[in-house]
A protein has these predicted regions:
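Glycine-biased, small-residue-rich flexible motifs in mid-sequence functional cores and linkers
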Residues: 1-139
Length: 139
């Protein structure tokens, strides 16, 4: 497993420091994608329809070959579908799980292999939570 690095505010992306309450610390596993890429956030339901899945996969597959980074959470549903479609299309992804980045803390547990694949494919996982913190109701 790729090591987890603690970033200080001076290492954060500039835009993150412009929000009203930026995190004091960020943890990253993997490497940040190139800054000159376009970042596309994908969000959706955990309880998706077959139509939602098909459209998500089709849209992301159509981005193959472009300098685009797919950004999403690590939840079941559209988040996971977006990451898998992006990886299949050769795109880099970034994931923001609602937990720490240790495999023992990642939620849902059945997405630890997906998290590893994201990192191994040149993407990253980012969290403001300490590495061993498990997901809670509102994280």
């Amino acid at each position: 497993m790729e090591s987890i690095v603690k970033l200080k505010p001076e290492e954060f992306p500039e835009q993150l420091l412009e929000i009203p309450q930026p995190p004091k610390t960020l943890y990253i596993r993997g490497k940040l994608p190139p800054k000159d890429h376009t970042y596309l956030a994908v969000v959706g339901s955990r309880k998706y329809t077959s139509y939602g899945r098909d459209i998500c996969e089709k849209l992301i597959t159509g981005l193959k070959g472009y300098p685009i980074v797919i950004v999403s959470g690590l939840a079941l549903g559209i988040d996971s579908i977006a990451h898998r479609a992006a990886l299949k299309a050769g795109l880099v992804t970034m994931s923001f799980p609602g937990s720490g980045l240790d495999n023992n803390a990642l939620y849902p547990r059945n997405n630890t292999a997906l998290a590893d694949e994201i990192v191994e494919s040149g993407g990253c996982l980012i969290s403001e939570f300490p590495p061993s913190m498990k997901a809670e109701l509102y994280t």
